Amino acid sequence: MHVSSLKVVLFGVCCLSLAACQTPAPVKNTASRSAASVPANEQISQLASLVAASKYLRVQCERSDLPDDGTILKTAVNVAVQKGWDTGRYQSLPQLSENLYQGLLKDGTPKATQCSSFNRTMTPFLDAMRTVR
């Protein structure tokens, strides 16, 4: 497996882990459990990955149905709030997501592979964006 392919797989796993967390659990107090189980730096990293992949889909994969960067960021913060995460530390989210996006542009993985992977793994987040608009 090429290093660039490994990056796409790891990025997809990160997206899937966050997407899986969007499904409500039948346990009371899920938000506080979720907030306690994911360190703040990991929260920001997961959200930045979602934002970067969404921007990649919109720009590189020509997904004109996806919103602008501001709406994507707003959706990411809304997801964090729904999870009970403390969004007060998210000032670095725009810059970190842009850094990840630039890294995706430099990645040697074929664009078609990245587009296909992101389209599959990002569905829950993309659906959440449609409600924010």
UniProtKB/Swiss-Prot annotation:
Keywords of the record: Cell outer membrane, Disulfide bond, Lipoprotein, Membrane, Palmitate, Protein transport, Signal, Transport
Subcellular compartments: Cell outer membrane
Disulfide-bond pairs as recorded: 61-115
InterPro entries, per the entry: Chap_lipoprot_PulS/OutS, Chap_lipoprot_PulS/OutS-like, PulS/OutS-like_sf
Pfam families given in the database record: T2SS_PulS_OutS (PF09691)
The keyword Acyltransferase is annotated on this UniProt entry: no
Any one GO BP annotation for this protein: intracellular protein transport
Lipid attachment points (S-diacylglycerol cysteine): 21
Membrane topology summary: Lipid-anchor
Signal sequence residues: 1-20
Function summary: Out proteins are required for the translocation of pectate lyases and cellulases across the outer membrane.
NCBIfam families: PulS_OutS
Name of this protein: Pilotin OutS
Gene (name only): outS
